[in-house]
């Protein structure tokens, strides 16, 4: 779903905001449906990622999801993008900022965190920071959610997105950029579940 404001967007067809794609779909509504159809299949090809998690891990997830549709899948974007009042990380800083965050993440011991509230706040902080990176031209949220599912599985937790309203998720992402991770943490409190609780 191409809803970004972009400067000099070579990812799109000339005089259009529709992303260039392998099926040569020029209509945004049809492309949105194609994305849903394709990713509903390709998501099942993604194997569980293992530590250490890096930018390459996220790129691989994105590639698996979208390479059927986009030639640039798994590649860090080289243009500036924004959505609403949110301006995402400038291309020149994406790799260095991603490396900084992944290095910090590697030092966390969420499997040793007994306080579920504290865990959810920590996860929310990282999620919001990674979300600001938005390293790809499209498909950032879908790839990032899968990455965090894998990270949390290794820490002994499962993420259940069931019952999560799209409007609440969007509001938490916007708040994560504008004011902090509190709204995201409040959502995660209900959707991050210890595996031992889910499977006694």
Model-based region annotation:
Residues 1-200:
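FIC/Doc superfamily catalytic core
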